[in-house]
């Protein structure tokens, strides 16, 4: 990798070499500054232009661009080029629905039903939902969008025995939590949520409009009602380039 080296004299007259600054880092800093000062949708100069301007290879340019795409600062559109990305959607970690979260940020939430049906609970899922292994579980898979842009793939699991005819109720209610409250008088009170990272599979990338292998945020939520009974187990995959989660922390009381 090409580097820039400069030198200066110290008070004693000796030559002191300063730290090497790889051209790659100068290029990436330039692009990063661009994402901070330019409006979303601003095109990034072509690879050959950047390579000539920074006297580096197109391979180096490609690496810098790809890293900023992964970080969600740039957006690559097939056949069109690379552009400054929109700011990430910021979501507080709290027990609210996707619909509530998006509307709180002035975004219009919509969902596309990918699959709905019954599966048989294995030992792990049975334990999460407090049902017998082999029991029926309603599995709902949805593509979550904000202002028409795909954001996440959400897969929800609920006990079919505890929530009979829920599948039909969801025809009337667009929000699952509203259906649980109004039809079954079940209100979520608390949940344990785990956040991990994963890489987009070909199917996930196709649904979310991202590159295969792009870092994803994988959330697992296990929710309980006011009596402490399990209500749902949800696994969601969010676009790492478009989403960030925010937690507010407090020191424990002495």
UniProtKB/Swiss-Prot annotation:
Disruption phenotype: Deletion of the gene results in a bald phenotype, mutant fails to produce aerial hyphae and spores on glucose-containing media. The mutant is arrested at an early stage of the developmental program.
Ranges for domain HTH gntR-type: 17-87
GO biological process terms held by the UniProt record: negative regulation of DNA-templated transcription
Function: Global regulator that is part of the nutrient-sensing system. In the absence of glucosamine 6-P (GlcN6P), represses the phosphotransferase system (PTS) specific for the uptake of N-acetylglucosamine (PTSNag), and genes involved in the metabolism of chitin, as well as several genes involved in development, thereby linking carbon availability to morphogenesis. Also regulates the expression of the ABC transporters DasABC and NgcEFG, which are involved in N,N'-diacetylchitobiose ((GlcNAc)2) uptake. Binds to the DNA consensus sequence 5'-ACTGGTCTAGACCACT-3'.
Induction field: Induced by (GlcNAc)2 and (GlcNAc)3.
GO cellular component terms given for this protein: cytoplasm
SMART domains recorded: HTH_GNTR, UTRA
Recorded superkingdom: Bacteria
Keyword Nucleus: no
Keywords annotated in UniProt: Cytoplasm, DNA-binding, Repressor, Transcription, Transcription regulation
Annotated S-S bridges: none
CDD domains: WHTH_GntR
Protein name from the UniProt record: HTH-type transcriptional repressor DasR
Compartments (UniProt record): Cytoplasm
Regulation: Binding to the target genes is abolished by GlcN6P, a central molecule in N-acetylglucosamine metabolism.
Record-linked SUPFAM superfamilies: Chorismate lyase-like, Winged helix' DNA-binding domain
Single Gene Ontology MF annotation: DNA-binding transcription factor activity
Residue ranges for the DNA-binding region feature of this UniProt entry: 47-66
